[in-house]
Every structure is written in structure tokens, then in C-alpha cells.
């Protein structure tokens, strides 16, 4: 397992398009992959059992609340979002208001949706620095 993220740097001539990055992530589903606004790619190993359990509990609680509330939808840690900076990030749990989600096209909803969730949870791992 990778204890801290592996950062890949690419020259501007080798930057991936959004579609290429999405395909790269699909081909490497066993890894947690994010991209920052500068095109640098962070590769993290899958979560350990303890972290996976905490993620599952947090996501479950958010999902139960969302189902009762009925005004939005939840997303698991395997979901990527394209932020306004161009970065693609995957929080440990996310929630988006239905009215905002429904403004996206089906094509946008299918890939890394170009939207910043209304609520996110990101667990701090042992390798994260503050």
C-alpha cells in the first residue's frame, strides 16, 4: 500500500483532457486518483479496513439523513467531482441538492460532474498533513 499519495507531474504538452482522465480512472479502479488544478495527479492506495469502516459508517449516516430529508442525493467515496478550478476530487461522502443536480445534463451526471457538492466529508488519514 502507498502510505502517502504518489504525485505524478506532467509537462503541459502531456496533460490529459477531462475525458482521458476519466478513462484513466476507470482503467485503474483499484486506486484512489485525484487531479489538482495544475494537472498533477495524486494516486493513493485503497483504504485500509479501519478507514473503510469509518467511511462506510459516515456515508451510511449521511445516506439515512438524505433519504429522510428528501431534498438531495448522496455520493460515495468512489465519486469524483470536477471543481470550478478544474481539479477533480473525491470526498469520502458528499451530498448535493436535487435542484442543483437536476440542472446538470445526463452526460455531465455520468462522468465527474462539474459541480461542487453542497456538503462534503473528508476523513483525515494518518498520512495527511494539516
Spell out what each predicted region is.
Residues 1-130:
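Gly/Pro/Ser/Thr-rich low-complexity, intrinsically disordered segments predominantly at protein N-termini
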